[in-house]
């Protein structure tokens, strides 16, 4: 479904950005160091962590994104990543994360710590990429049925409408089972980390 896949890069960048926010806040508070983790490992070895983190821990990152989307100020910060020319380099994501409110950053910090700790204590988790992709597409279909203007907002040039569409997609995913939400989050986070692990320059390509 092109109307969904076109913005997967932006949503993936948002998930990575809030995860980095959690790592940054935890680093400042000593949280991750207390557990023996270096926050920079999220970008360097994040895919290994992602493979090992159980569904509830991965879902915690989704819940952090969804909760922040309910706050107008933080939603505006995250929505900036949806613009086609947004800077989704590692530096750009860090700058975006730093602009989030304290409550959101602390929420992401808790989610990030849970991912690091759970991944360190768990074996690799099963993951069906094709199934996760289908669940993401199905969420897009549900959002288009429930929210007038969803497709036009997702594909159009209006910033506010695009943000509303992505938030509608998050709302639909929030009502799905944990395993489904975690699979979609794992898919998007994996795509975002794959980009960050590359040259990190400029905007993440939109597919």
Residue spans for each PLM region:
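Sequence contexts marking disulfide-bonded cysteines in secreted/extracellular proteins
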Residues: 78-80, 140, 162-164
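Bacterial N-terminal signal peptides that target proteins for export
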Residues: 2-12
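N-terminal Sec/ER secretory leader and immediately downstream segment
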Residues: 27-116
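A cross-kingdom marker for long, charged
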Residues: 157-207
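N-terminal leader/presequence regions that precede the main folded/catalytic core
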Residues: 3, 17, 26-31
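Bacterial N-terminal signal peptides
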Residues: 12-21
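Extended amphipathic alpha-helical interaction segments
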Residues: 90-157
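Generic structural signal for hydrophobic core residues of well-folded globular domains
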Residues: 53, 65, 69, 85, ...
